[in-house]
């Protein structure tokens, strides 16, 4: 098979795009290489291949190199690194506000919009000395599972340019897989970090709800959205998790709970030993109808590997998971219809038809009609209907009751096990255009990831190998209890070590 030029190559001392973030940080901090060299190497890689992949919506070369220069100058002056990742560049999903780059959420509604403030995640990255290479492509307002809902064109999977990298954060994961960035930030509302990670052979973590600030994260569904770290190794992901997590007074849903010791856990897991660890296998997931045979085969091989590493597998019964998809796709549109009401053409973003002949209502209507894409409109309509008089109790409140039962299922499971393992997706990456006209088929792709968001607990996707029938990447999902994020990293790092 011919070598795929779009996939990051094997480790090469002369090519910084093949190094892990931990390796880059060590050498930058020892002043054996410079952050500017590393950042430029990744900018060159973006220039070389992103025209074909379209992972980035905006590249900020000057800003990234200036940030890298600041790190190099501080180290040369004898200062200590401002974080364990200082000098290592990163790709940021275009749903976090930035003062020096547009924040579009991949929507025409926010085309060219410049935020007057940085998101807390953005501020923490800057304070940590991490150069931001640019803003990555996504499904519009984080609504979708393929990045095809972007108003600026789909991102392509580096493993097969005819296929999706997943969504909504396909741009961040594609950038990692292609060696355009060693680190990236995503958001996960129903699987938007974990699902692209699985389809691109990368690592993605959805932290416990409330542990990464949502201040400056443009809201899709406020009770479900959570920013999180992505990278190519479990340790790199843990190092980034440590940078962005922690209480934030600007976010009313921010948790004051101490950040879990994720880096320590990743290092502990690197031994590969899982003796004494109990892992739950969800009974309901085994009977999913939409499984691609190669994905199920790889998943069962992953379970055997975990057993060989000393883990005990325990079947757990989560009966309400069968209703998670229905509950999620009621709760999410309801929150979407409320959150996106602010995009009215009056205060910020696009304004259409304001020629002096139309009323404010007409301008607002035209702005929303032209500014939002089909999937966003679909979810606004669904949510508005479900919240309307006469339907609120039957739909929204009932979905919230199911959500509570799903949380109880998780709580009961974690009384028996330390973590739960599951597939991430029912199939490997599908072809672009294959599901775009079938929203229900697209929604089914989130079957294994969204229960976790409804419960507010944490989860990871770690590379699980390649499916025998498609030759494409799969992911193993590891789920932990609230504030048990360190368990993900211990099990994930051990599984990663066992595979290598």
Curated annotation (Swiss-Prot):
Residues forming the catalytic site: 93, 168, 192
UniProt keyword terms in alphabetical order: ATP-binding, Ligase, Nucleotide-binding, Protein biosynthesis
Cysteine disulfide partners in this protein: none
UniProt catalytic activity: L-glutamyl-tRNA(Gln) + L-glutamine + ATP + H2O = L-glutaminyl-tRNA(Gln) + L-glutamate + ADP + phosphate + H(+)
Annotated protein name in UniProt: Glutamyl-tRNA(Gln) amidotransferase subunit A
UniProt similarity note: Belongs to the amidase family. GatA subfamily.
A Pfam family it matches: Amidase
Source species, domain of life: Bacteria
Function: Allows the formation of correctly charged Gln-tRNA(Gln) through the transamidation of misacylated Glu-tRNA(Gln) in organisms which lack glutaminyl-tRNA synthetase. The reaction takes place in the presence of glutamine and ATP through an activated gamma-phospho-Glu-tRNA(Gln).
EC numbers: 6.3.5.7
Alphabetical list of NCBIfam families matching this protein: gatA (TIGR00132)
Molecular function (Gene Ontology), one example: glutaminyl-tRNA synthase (glutamine-hydrolyzing) activity
Class of this enzyme: ligase
Gene name, Swiss-Prot/TrEMBL: gatA
InterPro entries per UniProt: Amidase, Amidase_CS, Amidase_dom, AS_sf, GatA
Cellular component terms per the entry's GO annotation: glutamyl-tRNA(Gln) amidotransferase complex
Subunit structure: Heterotrimer of A, B and C subunits.
GO terms under biological process: translation
